[in-house]
């Protein structure tokens, strides 16, 4: 009987240990993080499950008990809010600075933009302008800041269609549901998106810096901590820079 109990305990322990570590990653990071995760796994056997989405939605889910152990956000606001609510080990760290990019269908040729007048013309000719929801996605918020700073908000506001995250907003342009839009450089420059679209990196002085922070949840396991540390390694930083991010 005692042997049976011990066997059951060991079986339960193994089952619990087999559960993958849940990692929440902002949608703008999908291409870069896919490569980072592959690099990490070459020397580590950690099993983790990655979910991509909007930083705002992840924050709400974590507040409501979602079992994420590492949150790689598209901004600082949402991770710091989780810290203030006592959900994280500490304030975490900024791992990258993102770049806002204007993207279009090939026929609109966003790469030819030289000035505000060119941008106004493209927006004026567009039927729909795609952005991420500004209350959920930092790149959507930055897009609105940019439009207002450039005096183009009135021209664009009635044409806006909103994606739940920056990945969805980008796909609106790729699919032709929108003629133009705003996205992250990391997505605009990815092979699958670039072959269908054209883009220009926008003046970063016209929106608040997109500082991207990551945080570990309280009681984060060793696997999450090791991945968090790898995100700050020279190898991971090199990948981030490849996708257009500025790294600390």
Where are these regions (language model features)?
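Sec-dependent N-terminal signal peptides
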Residues: 3-14
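Active-site-adjacent helical/loop segments in soluble small-molecule enzymes
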Residues: 99
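Exported/periplasmic ABC-transporter solute-binding proteins
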Residues: 19-45, 49-51, 56, 60-66, ...
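Absolute protein N-terminus
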Residues: 1-3, 17-20
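Short, P/G- and charge-enriched loop/turn segments at secondary-structure junctions
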Residues: 88-91
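Short active-site segment of divalent metal-dependent hydrolases/proteases
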Residues: 72
């Amino acid at each position: 009987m005692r042997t049976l109990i011990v066997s059951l305990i060991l079986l339960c322990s193994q089952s619990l240990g087999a559960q993958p570590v849940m990692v929440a990653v902002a949608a703008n990071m999908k291409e870069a993080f896919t490569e980072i995760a592959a690099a990490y796994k070459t020397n580590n056997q950690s099993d983790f499950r990655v979910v991509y989405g909007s930083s705002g939605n992840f924050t709400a889910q974590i507040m409501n008990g979602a079992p994420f152990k590492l949150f790689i956000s598209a901004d600082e606001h949402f991770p710091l809010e989780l810290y203030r609510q006592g959900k994280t080990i500490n304030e975490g760290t900024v791992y990258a600075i993102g770049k806002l990019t204007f993207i279009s269908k090939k026929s609109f040729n966003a790469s030819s933009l030289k000035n505000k007048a060119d941008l106004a013309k493209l927006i004026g000719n567009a039927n729909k302008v795609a952005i991420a929801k500004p209350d959920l996605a930092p790149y959507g918020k930055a897009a609105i800041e940019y439009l207002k700073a450039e005096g183009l908000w009135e021209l664009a506001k009635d044409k806006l269609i909103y994606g739940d995250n920056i990945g969805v907003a980008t796909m609106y342009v790729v699919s032709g549901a929108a003629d133009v839009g705003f996205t992250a450089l990391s997505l605009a420059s990815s092979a699958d998106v670039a072959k269908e679209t054209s883009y220009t990196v926008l003046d970063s002085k016209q929106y608040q810096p997109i500082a991207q922070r990551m945080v570990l949840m309280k009681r984060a396991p060793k696997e999450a901590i090791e991945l968090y540390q790898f995100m700050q390694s020279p190898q991971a930083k090199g990948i981030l820079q490849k996708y257009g991010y500025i790294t600390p």
